[in-house]
């Protein structure tokens, strides 16, 4: 069942098929003749895998069937992380790691390689990093103010979630639902923080942009 509340199932099915074709063509081109600009290839692969994960989740695909796309993001991002990792991408990458933490042995080396190359970070990313790498929960403060609002209750999450979309007005995907590049809006970071804090209230599934199925998987 489709999860997105803005576009149609047909829209996302067509988008998923398109991005799948783009990914396959990039893989085939790479296998035939390694491109001269390898860094550019890896950057495009990161985007391809990100697109498929987000569109696939919006479409309603199973969260475990999307896991290989997360692995694809990491395996390519680690090759270009030394150039810098955009902040919102870093937040998504680490929050998805928390949401898939039951399978972290399958991706932790790549995630660590990315983290080691990052020249700046944030309290939220450190929060996720410590949870994933050291199985510890530590206090944090983030430049994402809505994250600082989350306590140990559903009510605090609901209040924070009201600010999630508008807090990303400088993100490249902001307002994309008015274009044909829309892939869905999903607050992976809010769900990841809920997981660490142990907030699994069923009312979360009714919050706009909240990826509930990723939170309660398995």
Describe every region a protein language model picked out.
Residues 1-178, 182:
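Eukaryote-skewed repeat-based solenoidal scaffolds used as protein-protein interaction platforms
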Residues 155-218:
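Alpha-helical oligomerization segments
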